[in-house]
Amino acid sequence: MDFSHSDKVRALQEQVTAFMDAHVYPAEARFDEEMEKYRRGGNPWQPTVIMEDLKRKAKALNLWNLFLPESEHGAGLTNLEYAPLCEIMGRSHIAPEAFNCSAPDTGNMEVLARYGTPQQQQRWLVPLLDGKIRSAFAMTEPDVA
């Protein structure tokens, strides 16, 4: 199996690295400060100004929903193509959300894209893809909960 990166992936690596250097790393301290302010105020579950700005910039550069394979909504990358981008994004605790590639949203979007009804996709997938809402999931094992 050939594990070398395609020209497309190398270009995306350069774009993601440049975005991280120009926008994400410099925003980390401000993000942490905003979150601390929200925690002290008793409501850490609200969007930060800096994260919304990062999302807007990532969308504008088409560095958005890179995780979605075989989909009209994503970059159409395979896992092998997406992995080196994850390595770059994984260098910052705020990057996955900035690129709309954070758990559990990614898995939930994949499930909705593949198996959701048109109504479910309209109600939940579209706002998740746009980064307007967040999602969750819960699971248990038989005879446990």
Which residues fall in each region the model found?
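Glycine-rich flavin
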Residues: A29-A145
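Residue-level signal for inorganic ion chemistry
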Residues: V9, M20, T117
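Intrinsic disorder at enzyme termini
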Residues: M1-V16
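N-terminal glycine-rich anion-binding loops that anchor highly charged ligand groups
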Residues: A18-E28, A58-K59
